A protein has these predicted regions:
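Hydrophobic N-terminal alpha-helices or hydrophobic patches in metabolic proteins across all domains
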Residues: 1-185
């Protein structure tokens, strides 16, 4: 048995083109508002740190910075720079979504679902990276803790978490439902 795709008329491709354009536009908007995005990321980091630590946390959103350990002897601040933000880790997910939307428009709902889940995973991975840095600074001290937390373990968390998020996205976007598996059998 051979599967043949029916030709799609220009009128019915318009929503598809708009969806692809919307996903690409979301990527452009994220790049344009990355500073505001970083401020939100720092606010989220501050909220998480307030829950997991009692040593005092202050967020300077306008400086994209979070300070912790304020009640101790060695308070420390982290500034969220563009390369440390999850905003640029979201861009590959948006590009893959746009490409898959273009070539597999019938999977639009599944693609948007997988984009949402994977985007949340990327954001949480970056928060885990920040928590790793904070934990190591608290445990090993400022110099060694920051070195190990930011340079080595933080980078590993980002790379491995980003890869897992991308694999999760592709798996969610391309897997078949039970009904599709039964129909194919």
């Amino acid at each position: 048995m051979t599967a043949v795709n029916a030709p799609v008329s220009g009128a019915s491709r318009f929503p598809l083109r708009m969806a692809v354009f919307g996903v690409l536009a979301a990527g452009v908007v994220l790049v344009l508002v990355e500073r505001g995005y970083r401020e939100l990321e720092v606010q989220l980091a501050g909220a998480i740190l307030r829950v997991v630590t009692s040593s005092g946390v202050y967020v300077a959103g306008n400086r994209e910075s979070v300070y912790f350990g304020l009640s101790g002897d060695t308070p420390f601040g982290l500034r969220m720079t563009p390369e440390c933000s999850s905003v640029f880790l979201l861009l590959p997910l948006l590009l893959v979504t746009a490409a898959l939307l273009w070539f597999r428009p019938q999977n639009a709902r599944r693609l948007f679902f997988s984009l949402g889940i994977s985007a949340i995973a990327v954001i949480l991975v970056n928060q885990l990276r920040i928590l790793t840095i904070v934990g190591l600074v608290n445990g090993l001290g400022t110099d060694e803790g920051y070195y190990w937390g930011h340079t080595l373990l933080g980078s590993l968390v980002s790379v491995i978490g980003g890869a897992i998020s991308l694999v999760l996205f592709v798996w969610l976007a391309t897997r078949k439902t039970k009904a599709e598996k039964r129909a194919a059998a």
